[in-house]
Amino acid sequence: MAENLEIPADLKPADGRFGCGPSKVRPEQLKALAASGDLFGTSHRQAPVKNLVGRVRDGLRQLFALPDGYEVILGNGGSTAFWDAAAFGLVDKRSLHLTYGEFSAKFASAVAKNPFVGDPIIVKADAGSAPKPQSDPSVDVIAWAHNETSTGVAVPVVRPDGSGDALIVIDATSAAGGLPVDITEADAYYFAPQKNFAGDGGLWLAILSPAALARVDAIAAAGRWVPEFLSLPIAIENSLKNQTYNTPAIATLILLAEQIDWLLGNGGLDWATKRTAESSSRLYSWAEAASFATPFVADPALRSQVVGTVDFSDSVDAAAVAKVLRANGVVDTEPYRKLGRNQLRVGMFPAVEPDDVSALTACVDWVVERL
């Protein structure tokens, strides 16, 4: 059986986790978690946990070099919850969405179901490509994903010409902390801990500009009904006190804080993005040279530094390759389930060693030769 193939130990990566979320958690984070037992089982309204939340917020402020007036806001529920929160609390009348994969389309879908706003404008591209950011005079929110996790397409964060007062709302779930960004080009840059920040899910974080904060206030003042769990005014009020509206998962916050400190200690966002650029360069160079593989994203300018997708020729069964890799401790290289392509998908977040990406490609070569 193919899955019984045993990859030589000297070819294997030091750490075989290449998932695109949840992603590799560094051992040092887990040690810090184990050493923080006195925080567990204590009130999130008291100083010890509030200081932990403050550590996360201050670290992100430093990591992204936030200008005065920008705030780090957080709440429970992950990016999925933030889509609904933004649909209620950031879209005033109408929005425009660039969709080019599963996750960029989901925010558009959430807005389309919101009874308080007009039908969104959808600008769509096929998986593996992306539309160019654009504006429309009828919209007050323009939204896209900095990194489309399902396909490995990255779209830069730049305010489109003619966007005026429209808020630029960026899904950075798998981008924040691993892709370059000028935060002043966005009004809401939202993400979750289980990608570049090597943590657990269940939490959303959003960097909001003064314009976004003002929009939240204006919509609330107009009396729009919003479920309290999805209320951005409530999230903002609590975040400014270094709290969440309802009880957070302490372990998630500890892992996140440790990863932020690690990124800052190594040189911040500049260091992190150089590291992911190195990892992705190794993956794409290998794919371009391999006789049986090619990068799924044809345009090099759109290829993600943090999520790499590699198509295989019909002569090679990528699912069989992934099965052998998994049996050998090299895990989570399977493609996004709904994409339905003969490919591997590789997470290359900052916690992943570039040398491990090179080792992964060597393992794939070894397996393909023997299938």
UniProtKB/Swiss-Prot annotation:
<comment type="function">
    <text>Catalyzes the reversible conversion of 3-phosphohydroxypyruvate to phosphoserine and of 3-hydroxy-2-oxo-4-phosphonooxybutanoate to phosphohydroxythreonine.</text>
</comment>
<feature type="binding site">
    <location>
        <position position="45"/>
    </location>
    <ligand>
        <name>L-glutamate</name>
    </ligand>
</feature>
<feature type="binding site">
    <location>
        <position position="171"/>
    </location>
    <ligand>
        <name>pyridoxal 5'-phosphate</name>
    </ligand>
</feature>
<comment type="similarity">
    <text>Belongs to the class-V pyridoxal-phosphate-dependent aminotransferase family. SerC subfamily.</text>
</comment>
<feature type="binding site">
    <location>
        <position position="149"/>
    </location>
    <ligand>
        <name>pyridoxal 5'-phosphate</name>
    </ligand>
</feature>
<dbReference type="InterPro" id="IPR000192">
    <property type="entry name" value="Aminotrans_V_dom"/>
</dbReference>
<comment type="subunit">
    <text>Homodimer.</text>
</comment>
<dbReference type="GO" id="GO:0005737">
    <property type="term" value="C:cytoplasm"/>
</dbReference>
<keyword id="KW-0718">Serine biosynthesis</keyword>
<dbReference type="GO" id="GO:0006564">
    <property type="term" value="P:L-serine biosynthetic process"/>
</dbReference>
<keyword id="KW-0028">Amino-acid biosynthesis</keyword>
<keyword id="KW-0032">Aminotransferase</keyword>
<feature type="binding site">
    <location>
        <position position="194"/>
    </location>
    <ligand>
        <name>pyridoxal 5'-phosphate</name>
    </ligand>
</feature>
<keyword id="KW-0963">Cytoplasm</keyword>
<dbReference type="GO" id="GO:0008615">
    <property type="term" value="P:pyridoxine biosynthetic process"/>
</dbReference>
<dbReference type="GO" id="GO:0008453">
    <property type="term" value="F:alanine-glyoxylate transaminase activity"/>
</dbReference>
<dbReference type="InterPro" id="IPR015422">
    <property type="entry name" value="PyrdxlP-dep_Trfase_small"/>
</dbReference>
<feature type="binding site">
    <location>
        <position position="103"/>
    </location>
    <ligand>
        <name>pyridoxal 5'-phosphate</name>
    </ligand>
</feature>
<keyword id="KW-0664">Pyridoxine biosynthesis</keyword>
<dbReference type="GO" id="GO:0030170">
    <property type="term" value="F:pyridoxal phosphate binding"/>
</dbReference>
<feature type="binding site">
    <location>
        <begin position="246"/>
        <end position="247"/>
    </location>
    <ligand>
        <name>pyridoxal 5'-phosphate</name>
    </ligand>
</feature>
<protein>
    <recommendedName>
        <fullName>Putative phosphoserine aminotransferase</fullName>
        <ecNumber>2.6.1.52</ecNumber>
    </recommendedName>
</protein>
<dbReference type="GO" id="GO:0019265">
    <property type="term" value="P:glycine biosynthetic process, by transamination of glyoxylate"/>
</dbReference>
<feature type="modified residue" description="N6-(pyridoxal phosphate)lysine">
    <location>
        <position position="195"/>
    </location>
</feature>
<dbReference type="InterPro" id="IPR022278">
    <property type="entry name" value="Pser_aminoTfrase"/>
</dbReference>
<keyword id="KW-0808">Transferase</keyword>
<keyword id="KW-0663">Pyridoxal phosphate</keyword>
<dbReference type="InterPro" id="IPR015424">
    <property type="entry name" value="PyrdxlP-dep_Trfase"/>
</dbReference>
<dbReference type="Pfam" id="PF00266">
    <property type="entry name" value="Aminotran_5"/>
</dbReference>
<dbReference type="GO" id="GO:0004648">
    <property type="term" value="F:O-phospho-L-serine:2-oxoglutarate aminotransferase activity"/>
</dbReference>
<comment type="pathway">
    <text>Cofactor biosynthesis; pyridoxine 5'-phosphate biosynthesis; pyridoxine 5'-phosphate from D-erythrose 4-phosphate: step 3/5.</text>
</comment>
<dbReference type="InterPro" id="IPR015421">
    <property type="entry name" value="PyrdxlP-dep_Trfase_major"/>
</dbReference>
<dbReference type="GO" id="GO:0004760">
    <property type="term" value="F:L-serine-pyruvate transaminase activity"/>
</dbReference>
<dbReference type="InterPro" id="IPR006272">
    <property type="entry name" value="Pser_aminoTfrase_mycobac"/>
</dbReference>
<comment type="pathway">
    <text>Amino-acid biosynthesis; L-serine biosynthesis; L-serine from 3-phospho-D-glycerate: step 2/3.</text>
</comment>
